[in-house]
Amino acid sequence: MSLVEAKSIPVLPIPNRKVCARSIFGIDVDMEVPAFAERTQFVPDIDQAYVFDKVTTIAILAGFKHNRSVMIQGYHGTGKSTHIEQVAARLNWPTIRINLDGHISRLDLIGKDAIVIRDGKQVTEFCEGILPWAIQNPTALVFDEYDAGRPDLMFVIQRVMEAEGKLTLLDQKRVISRHSGFRLFSTTNTVGLGDSTGLYHGTQQINQGQMDRWHIVTTLNYLKHTTEIKIILSKEPYYDTEEGRESISNMVRVADLTRSGFITGDISTVMSPRTVLVWAQNARIFDDIGLAFQLSFLNRCDETERVIVAEYFQRCFNIDLKESASNLIMGR
């Protein structure tokens, strides 16, 4: 979304109804959450097959209901951002998602002078960035990869993190207050203390004064084996046969082994649920589950670790890949 587009967006309506968390999200909790009666262009699409994690869902709902800033930490591919979007989708809550990559600048967030056409003439005019617009509307602002944000951006964001936080536009001599329906979320791979695993190059240590402003910090781990199978089958109903379910179960077993191997330090690359889904899709494309595994995951792994990963595959499917130890010994 450009600065000029943000300036031209109309003011959004406010939450005008309440929904029951138990009936909407299927979790065992008594909570009524504010929501919108109608959808707008900013509301994420609903994924009917999405499976909600109870603790993470409660944390996000508390953020929406009680105006709490919520941070979700977890490994890649666990569905942190998607979880926020799917909660917001069922509340019809407008959601803006910003990835804090190295190219996002302070001017992108706050705004800058831009040339616009007024009465047929070019004039220089200040155009608000996405942050001033978002905090003046009932939106859920999601900062993806929050721990990869540049330090100068962190202090801009810090201004609006408190429940009654205000944003000062120095160039405009304006002070903007938070809309009562504005909500703030973030997703991170670390908890602000830097990356000790070596998996997440580019992440930063986060100022602890800022970490203290996140009211709720929750962790979203990888899914249970049976839950992950259920999700893959819902996304790829082609496999919903006896043979297909066995194949998906074995795929998830391989993923579980990579996660266990990562935890014990045997390998440095983890198979996420997203990768399992891609593997299942590629297996249909190539009609070869072993080739699909190589192209979807194995080729990403360090060469010194491919033997271990190939053994995970062999253990689950009883198929030897060329990288497996037995083939290397035989010189195949």
Could you describe each region identified by the protein language model?
Residues 1-40, 50, 57, 224-225, ...:
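Alpha-helical lid/collar subdomain of P-loop NTPases
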Residues 2-245:
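AAA+ P-loop NTPase catalytic core and its hallmark functional loops
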